[in-house]
Curated annotation (Swiss-Prot):
It is an enzyme of class 2 (transferase). Catalyzes the formation of 6,7-dimethyl-8-ribityllumazine by condensation of 5-amino-6-(D-ribitylamino)uracil with 3,4-dihydroxy-2-butanone 4-phosphate. This is the penultimate step in the biosynthesis of riboflavin. This is 6,7-dimethyl-8-ribityllumazine synthase. The active site is at H96 (proton donor). Signal peptide: none annotated. It comes from Albidiferax ferrireducens (strain ATCC BAA-621 / DSM 15236 / T118). The gene is ribH. Keywords: Riboflavin biosynthesis, Transferase.
Amino acid sequence: MLDANQGTLAASDSRLNGKKLRIGIVQARFNEPITNTLAQACKAELLALGVAEKHIDLVQVPGALEVPVALLALAEKLEYDALVAVGCIIRGETYHFELVANESGAGVSRVALDYQIPIANAILTTENLAQAIARQTEKGRDAARVAVEMANLLSDI
């Protein structure tokens, strides 16, 4: 079985140098205790990777389905090197979970491809609150690292 950290870079790797980058974060407020922790962990990691605080913008939207339209608005500004989608969808008793998870994920991917901008997707999709709590900090940090690495990669291509 593969370790969850397989494929991660050392913090000293130049691909994780965020000093010249501008990053936008879109946070869904639904399940806010989880999404607050995700966003805080993401921002803390961006700062640790050298992204200046003044170059990190955070906008909030009601829920995961609204994340793609806010990402689109940020992408259209052409001011960001990468974006991060933050949200939390916890399975309930209805089909709504699948709808929200699938549509928000597809929307995030569409914006990334249409605007050729890296978007780290930290919209958690979990079976229960305990799974979300267990992942909230690590996935926020992971999203920051993905955003910085992909922004640097695209600038080098």
